[in-house]
């Protein structure tokens, strides 16, 4: 069959499900069976299709239904027998039983109440039963296709005939899905033929003959040879008469084929069931109502055949069973009153949106005429033929073409000539083969080598990939790409104009040559057609209209009627325009080339379009503060939800991979600050000290001499580019964390930095790893560090891109050198040779120094920003966008530095850091950080008090493997701080004394009397051992401390926190101290049984003595009786069982009580 069925469509939608798409709101509730509506053949076919699909996996049930119909037709059973057997056969499918009511005679009806028992209604008298029985036979036989009873035809043959008829009708319905009028006309032909057969029963036949039916169907299916051939199997006699010309009319469009040679036995076989007229039994005369319209019983409350047909169509178009079940689930939500009608339309719009007819029918069922929220999608399906082919399983070429299956019957084409039937060695990649387009496609298709040029394509069809099926999202074109597209469009339009004009000139020149060879009399008689002597009517007309405008029709008419006079004039004008336009093209080429050169590099860079705007917003102070606050809020939310333990972890982490970039960043900032008249000279000196001494100390970098750094910056600015030092060549080892920095006591004093004598450079040594610096900063310092890190990261990107391009250039040069040596010719750049590319003014080795010089020029205003960006694009191509806002970034950093040197809080932050660094509280070795915990806590507390009105940031600089990692953490300073300075000093001193070692008591026994923390026995052992150690020390026999710790495992990992507001200490979970000797666990396992036995014996001895002193014999006996359940008074009957087991080698008695039932009371 042509579809995959929809058996559950009726049950899914028309079942007994309360308020649903059936019943009063969905279907049409019938009356008690006193009125019948006309039933059509498609209703019967739809019902049979439902039965076949529902029992597709159970053919015995379907064949049983066909057998019931056969027996009913032969009057072997009556109408109640049919009802009873059909009800038993479909007892698990109430929708099919209710649907069967449509074919029952008047007065009969099957109802299914809520209790599930069948309620069969029938006429009251037997006479009515007999008449209705005859009616029912006629009624059902009118609707259900069948065959005449032949005893030699088996039941299986009947099933095949039914299947063939249903499959054929469904095939027609699918084929002409886009032309429903053809399908309706076909059904009308069947209705007319059957009705005439009934009306002429018992009288001379005056209706349509089989030959007339076949002729009308052939005219209806013009061009559909496969459908007509299959229809001929149902009317073999009529088809044969038409083919042989003996019928009432001949079909000239249908040619003879293999059906002309019909075997003899096929002529004698019974007529198939599709068009067989209905005949009454010959031996029993009945009261017939055949002259009236057919009637249908009132349809039950579970749905109508129209609804069943709708769901069958939905299942066929959705194809996937899973998708169809999801569609039914949406309707189930509506049945359960969980969604409204409008919401149901929204739910089913993804399923039915591509099928407007089904969607409109669905809305009509709901009573909704119009869907305002989502217009249905246009149906993009192809013709009916393409729906019958599974292109997914067909052979393919690429992603756009599929091969038709070999079983596919080609449509008839009347426009092909003999050349189309030659050897099949060429093919065309075209998907059109119909009558109207064959010849046009034959002319305009492209040929593929390897196949014969004389054959049209009948195999490969175009298989489109819809844009909405693709997940690729194309980016929006930039303005520079649009400019390139406009240039290409203009060039294309001009080329089309020139080529059109040139083609017209060639055509008219050929006409002029032809006229020159004619006699004068022939020239006067010569006329041109609409093509004006060429092969196209359009090209010449366009060229003439372009030149003459409104006068073009007159010129064209003159060329046709008087070509001798008109052709030379028009040809001269065309050639003049050709020269004029060629000269204009040369001028346009220069303009287009300039536009290409300006927009080409810009069009390649998609990120630079929005980078400057977004970067300006991202580098604002508010954006930087919002970034870390959002991370802080996220951590707090995770902690409050219990997803993470409260811990001190950084909110932002940045990596400085190359510390040499710090010098370049400092040089750029100093260069800009030095040339700002708004910054006072004193502030400039302080800024230089921060950049060249304070900041490098945070990053464990070399501290530069101020005077030398400024002179080197000026020399680099004034020196030629070829002598600028590379950052990689200027690298020097950085000092370690313990190297003595220059005297920082007067770093922010009144004396300018240039007056201080230069310090000797420190001795180079290998930088240490796992060292850190701790710095508590306020908002302004946080902004500066973030901007400084952004500047360094962008400088590093530019530097690495320059190194990468240099490496690629050298690799390419080596490859070209090897190739040139093999060919023995000089290698050169083709773009250079063609003068399409100008040599770069900057060598690749100098790209990074040249970039720094351009940034300096941009900062001082000696270079235009547009020129700066274009030069960067030429140097770094699509990676240059990171340097476009370098001037704005340096200006923001200079503005923050001015705040740092002019704000008192910022200066106090630096002074506090320098003081704490001298105390060892601002960094050191990472492994000994626990030693500095108290001092760092004190430093943090002082910093929070200093920045009471601002945010406090904990910034750590960690040096590891040649890199510096900067972490930033926003601290919570909202807890109440004490205002009493005496109490504050006392707390700081207490914390430092508690955690530190220098404040510990010298005597181990001091303070133990108030709250002893040791057991007395351990304390005694310690005193004896301590005295012996002192005696050995006096004799010089004491062991060294490391010998005493041999074989001892220990760890000091306990962590604690102090609440400054409450002076309470809180220990951190999963942190502890431990110490034990190696081998003690093994020895403990060996001696454990002995220790347990000794403890058990001690306990037994103590217990025996206690019993003798405190318990009498009678009391012990009573307790023993009670325990064993032998005491009867006020006790539930029970019995105690004693079991002796051994636990760790010791006998242990276990008691278990078993309760018995209490005897029933009298």
Curated annotation (Swiss-Prot):
Record PTM Phosphoserine, positions in chain: 709, 712
Residues annotated as region Middle-domain? 394-430
Q: Where is the composition biased (Gly residues)?
A: 1-21
Q: So where does this one cross the membrane?
A: none
- Gene Ontology biological process terms from the UniProt entry: negative regulation of cell migration; negative regulation of transcription by RNA polymerase II
* Domain called PAH: residue spans: 37-107, 153-238, 292-369
GO MF annotation: an example: transcription corepressor activity
- Return the InterPro entries for the record: HDAC_interact_dom, PAH, PAH_sf, Sin3-like, Sin3_C
Give the start-end ranges of region Disordered.
Answer: 1-29, 246-284, 706-765
User: By what name is this protein known?
Assistant: Paired amphipathic helix protein Sin3b
Q: Which organism is it from?
A: Homo sapiens (Human)
């Amino acid at each position: 069959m042509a579809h995959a069925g929809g058996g559950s469509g009726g049950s899914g939608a028309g079942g007994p499900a309360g308020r649903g798409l059936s019943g009063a709101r969905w279907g049409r509730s019938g009356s008690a069976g006193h009125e019948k509506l006309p039933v059509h053949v498609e209703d019967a076919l739809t019902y049979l299709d439902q039965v076949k699909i529902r029992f597709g996996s159970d053919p015995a049930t379907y064949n049983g239904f066909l057998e019931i119909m056969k027996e009913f037709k032969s009057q072997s059973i009556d109408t109640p027998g049919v009802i009873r057997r059909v009800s038993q056969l479909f007892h698990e499918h109430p929708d099919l039983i209710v649907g069967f009511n449509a074919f029952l005679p008047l007065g009969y009806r099957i109802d299914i109440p809520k209790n599930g028992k069948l309620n069969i209604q029938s006429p009251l008298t037997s006479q009515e039963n007999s008449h209705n029985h005859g009616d029912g036979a006629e009624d059902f036989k009118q609707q259900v296709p069948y065959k005449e009873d032949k005893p030699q035809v088996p039941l299986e043959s009947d099933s095949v005939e039914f299947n063939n008829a249903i499959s054929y009708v469904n095939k027609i319905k699918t084929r002409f899905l886009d032309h429903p009028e053809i399908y309706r006309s076909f059904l009308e032909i069947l209705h007319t033929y059957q009705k005439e057969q009934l009306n002429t029963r018992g009288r001379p036949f005056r209706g349509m003959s089989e030959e007339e039916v076949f002729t009308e169907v052939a005219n209806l299916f013009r061009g559909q040879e496969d459908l007509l051939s299959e229809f001929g199997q149902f009317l073999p006699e009529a088809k044969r008469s038409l083919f042989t010309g003996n019928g009432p009319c001949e079909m000239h469009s249908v040619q003879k084929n293999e059906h002309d040679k019909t075997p003899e036995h096929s002529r004698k076989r019974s007529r198939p069931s599709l068009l067989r007229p209905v005949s009454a039994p010959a031996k029993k005369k009945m009261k017939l109502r055949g002259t009236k319209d057919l009637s249908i019983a009132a349809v039950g409350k579970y749905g109508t055949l129209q609804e069943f047909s709708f769901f069958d169509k939905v299942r066929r178009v959705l194809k996937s069973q899973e998708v169809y079940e999801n569609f039914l689930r949406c309707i189930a939500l509506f049945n359960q009153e969980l969604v409204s009608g409008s919401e149901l339309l929204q739910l089913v719009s993804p399923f039915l949106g591509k099928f407007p007819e089904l969607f409109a029918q669905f809305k009509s069922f709901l009573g909704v005429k119009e869907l305002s929220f989502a217009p249905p999608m246009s149906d993009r399906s192809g013709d009916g033929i393409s729906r019958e082919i599974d292109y997914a399983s067909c052979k393919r070429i690429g992603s756009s073409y599929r091969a038709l299956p070999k079983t596919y019957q080609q449509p008839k084409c009347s426009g092909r000539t003999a050349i189309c039937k030659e050897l099949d060695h060429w093919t065309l990649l075209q998907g059109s083969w119909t009558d109207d387009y064959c010849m046009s496609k034959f002319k305009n298709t492209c040929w593929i080598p390897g196949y014969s040029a004389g054959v049209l394509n009948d195999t490969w069809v175009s298989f489109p990939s819809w844009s909405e099926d693709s997940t690729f999202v194309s980016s929006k074109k930039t303005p520079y790409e649009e400019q390139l597209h406009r240039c290409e469009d203009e060039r294309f339009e001009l080329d089309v104009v020139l080529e059109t004009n040139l083609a017209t000139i060639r055509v008219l020149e050929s006409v002029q040559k032809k006229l020159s060879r004619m006699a004068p009399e022939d020239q006067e008689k010569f006329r041109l057609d609409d093509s004006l002597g060429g092969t196209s009517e359009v090209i010449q007309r366009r060229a003439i209209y372009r030149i003459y405008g409104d006068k073009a029709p007159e010129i064209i008419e003159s060329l046709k009627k008087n070509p001798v006079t008109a052709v030379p004039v028009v040809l001269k004008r065309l050639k003049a325009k050709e020269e004029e336009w060629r000269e204009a093209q040369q001028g346009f080429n220069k303009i287009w080339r300039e536009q290409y050169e300006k927009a080409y590099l810009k069009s390649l860079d998609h990120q630079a379009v929005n980078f400057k705007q977004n970067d300006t917003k991202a580098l604002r102070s508010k954006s930087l503060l919002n970034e870390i606050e959002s991370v802080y809020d996220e951590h707090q939310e995770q902690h409050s939800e219990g997803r993470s333990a409260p811990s001190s972890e950084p909110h932002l982490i940045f990596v400085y991979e190359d510390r040499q970039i710090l010098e370049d960043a400092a040089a750029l900032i100093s260069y800009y600050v030095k040339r700002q008249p708004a910054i006072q000279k004193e502030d400039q000196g302080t800024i230089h000290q921060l950049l060249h001494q304070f900041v490098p100390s945070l990053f464990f970098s070399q501290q530069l001499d101020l005077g030398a750094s400024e002179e080197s910056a000026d020399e680099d600015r004034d020196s030629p580019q070829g002598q600028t030092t590379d950052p990689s060549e200027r690298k020097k080892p950085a000092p370690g964390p313990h190297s003595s920095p220059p005297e920082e006591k007067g770093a922010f004093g009144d004396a300018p930095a240039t007056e201080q004598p230069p310090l000797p450079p420190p001795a180079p040594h290998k930088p240490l790893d796992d060292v850190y610096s701790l710095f508590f900063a306020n908002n302004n310092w946080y902004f500066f560090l973030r901007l400084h890190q952004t500047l360094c990261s962008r400088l590093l990107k530019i530097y690495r891109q320059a190194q990468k391009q240099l490496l690629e250039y050298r690799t390419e040069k080596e490859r070209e050198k090897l190739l040139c040596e093999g060919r023995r010719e000089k290698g050169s750049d083709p773009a250079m040779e063609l003068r399409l590319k100008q040599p770069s003014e900057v060598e690749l080795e100098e790209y990074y120094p040249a970039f720094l010089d351009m940034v300096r020029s941009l900062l001082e205003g000696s270079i235009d920003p547009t020129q700066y960006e274009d030069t960067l694009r030429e140097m770094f191509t699509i990676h240059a966008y990171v340097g476009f806002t370098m001037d704005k970034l340096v200006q923001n950093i200079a503005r923050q530095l001015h705040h740092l040197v002019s704000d008192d809080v910022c200066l106090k932050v630096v002074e506090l850091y320098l003081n704490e660094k001298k105390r060892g509280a601002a960094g050191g070795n990472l492994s000994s950080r626990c030693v500095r915990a108290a001092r760092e806590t004190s430093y943090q507390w002082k910093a929070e008090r200093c920045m009471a009105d601002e945010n406090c940031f904990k910034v750590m600089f960690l040096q590891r493997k040649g890199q510096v990692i900067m972490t930033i953490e926003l601290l919570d300073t909202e807890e109440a701080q004490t205002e009493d300075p005496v109490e504050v000093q006392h707390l700081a001193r207490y914390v430092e004394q508690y955690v530190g070692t220098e404040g510990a008591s010298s005597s181990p026994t001091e303070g133990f009397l108030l709250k002893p923390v040791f057991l007395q026995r351990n304390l005694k052992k310690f005193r004896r051992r301590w005295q012996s150690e002192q005696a050995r020390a006096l004799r010089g026999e004491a062991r060294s401390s490391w010998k005493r710790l041999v074989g001892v495992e220990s760890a000091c990992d306990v962590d604690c926190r102090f609440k400054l507001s409450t002076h309470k200490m809180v220990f951190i979970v999963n942190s502890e101290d431990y110490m034990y000797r190696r081998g003690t666990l093994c020895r403990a396992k060996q001696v454990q049984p002995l220790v347990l036995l000794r403890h058990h014996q001690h306990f037994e001895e103590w217990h025996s003595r206690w019993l003798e002193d405190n318990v009498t014999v009678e009391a012990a006996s009573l307790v023993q009786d009670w325990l064993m359940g032998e005491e009867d008074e006020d006790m539930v009957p029970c019995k105690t069982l004693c079991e002796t087991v051994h636990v760790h080698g010791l006998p242990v008695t276990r008691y278990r009580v078993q309760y018995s039932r209490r005897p029933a009371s009298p």
